[in-house]
Amino acid sequence: METDPANSSSKSPAVVSEKDVLIPEPSENTVGVVQDPVSAEREAHEDSISTEASVAKVDDTQMPASSTGSEPLSKTDDIVPCPPGSSPRESPPSIFSSSGLSSWAKSFKFQQQDPNRTDSGMSAFTRFTSELGLHLPTKGSEEVGDSRSSNTQVGGAFESLTKAVVDSSRGAVKAMQVKARHIVSQNKRRYQEGEFDLDMTYITENIIAMGFPAGDISSGLFGFFEGLYRNHMEEVIKFFETHHKDKYKVYNLCSERLYDASRFEGKVASFPFDDHNCPPIQLIPSFCQSAYTWLKEDIQNVVVVHCKAGMARTGLMICCLLLYLKFFPTAEEAIDYYNQKRCLDGKALVLPSQIRYVKYYERVQNQFDGKVPPERRCMLRGFRLINCPYWIRPAITISNHTDILFSTKKHQKTKDLGPEDFWIKAPKKGVVVFAIPGEAGLTELAGDFKIHFQDSDGDFYCWLNTTLTDNRTMLKGSDFDGFDKRKLPAPGFHVEIVMIEPDNSQPTKSKSDSTQQQSQSSSSADSSKLKSNEKDDDVFSDSDGEEEGNSQSYSTNEKTASSMHTTSKPHQINEPPKRDDPSANRSVTSSSSSGHYNPIPNNSLAVSDIKAIAADASVFSFGDEEEDYESD
């Protein structure tokens, strides 16, 4: 009897092999990648149904053959799949069960939608992925990203461009500074080692000469901007802190520029005097003693001397220090050594007055045991210009370190006269003299004094010291500061400076009284002869038309001189009145028939009066009228 297939299938359970059982294992891909909340929920439901069916099949295979399918299928919800080889009770609940999916879904915490958020227009999937930390590109985000990236690129390009411009500007400024500093330093030797390039020279291992350390606001606004082309303060400090830390002391010689001494930790000493000038003679031994005291404290100590350029004033004081320390026996050797060390061409200390003061200090060392002798007081009598061409007729100013002692522009008798009027031709050819008639001298001097000749072709001047200078001093043109800068030549030009003691009206005469009287009696004849000679010599005449234009004045001068020398009772002015004499206020006296002096008021002197008085050789007599002057 044939059985019905339908009945047989309902009566006998279906046999399911292990191959037919599909037990999916959880993986990272299964957990992490979720496409959409709706689709994810649908897939979870389908997986749950398939899992229940699979469990049911497994359960049927494990049931005995005699069992029937009378138990309801709803009990399969409590069955949890487990891996093969393990008991169902020991395995944890699977995430693919309903309870596992519920707990897995609860682990996600979604924030509430903020209506004010800018991403409210985003899709649900985009918001979901953003909550999971998966920033997937969208059209809006691409636009925002493009704008941000473009802004970033523009900002980066601008920043790079700005940095390049700043770097190039700094490089250009640095190059300009280096160029300017080399131009300003000119022929001076520079210290160029390692990272340093400074206007600085080691004269010895312990004596350094350098330019002014500028660039600090404490030295004033001009000193601050000088840092662009001079040694910069920061670089100088860095150099000494690197090479001579706690072993250096700075000596500032500038009177026109100071700075905060604390920048050098207070190790700064100031010995100021003006540029292109000489110091008070007492300042030199004080400087040398201070430097020596610092050097002997430690063998590694160094002294750093500077003025503005670090050449002339610095050279004067360093050369004197070399003499003080017995490096050299003579001033010439010390000056030559310093010049070779400081400058490439050996022209550092070149001003004649400053060289003269180094020689003064040599005399102080050798003759006065290093101590400056007391100041000698004397009277400046006048000047004589020898081999003087007509184009040299300077105004005169006498001064010291604090005051102006005499000036032809301010003196009562000369302030209204031009230089060509108060410089008087002497009987000797090419000689002009200057003195104040009727006065003991131009001014009283003591110690250092400066003679400044102000001429249209260029000023020239010199510094002297009464204690270390003779009463009669002859200086060549090359002995004056600034004379070499004049355009017009003056070969053989000399200046004789005549000083007298305060208690004497005239210096000691080199000729006898009889010779002097003979010279005075022949002054009118010499004056007449000089007149005829000067007509043929344009070099020593004031102008081409002077002789003709002033012939009447010369005639008056000769007559006045003759009358002053041929009276029956001559009252020649061999000596000007002393200052303590009541007649000191008289400018000049003349002869009269009664033999008495008639004073001429000071304010009555005119150009013709000065020239008339100048014809009398005794007024401008320095005691050597017979002396001849030869051109060098």
Curated annotation (Swiss-Prot):
Domain of life: Eukaryota
Keywords: Hydrolase, Lipid metabolism, Phospholipid metabolism, Phosphoprotein, Protein phosphatase
Catalytic site positions: C307
Region (Disordered): 1-98, 504-603
Phosphoserine modification, residue list: S541
Gene Ontology terms, MF aspect: phosphatidylinositol phosphate phosphatase activity; phosphatidylinositol-3,4,5-trisphosphate 3-phosphatase activity; protein tyrosine phosphatase activity
Record's compositionally biased regions (Acidic residues): 535-549
Ranges of Low complexity composition bias in the record: 87-98, 505-527, 584-594
Protein name (database record): Phosphatidylinositol 3,4,5-trisphosphate 3-phosphatase and protein-tyrosine-phosphatase PTEN2B
Organism: Arabidopsis thaliana (Mouse-ear cress)
Gene, per the UniProt record: PTEN2B
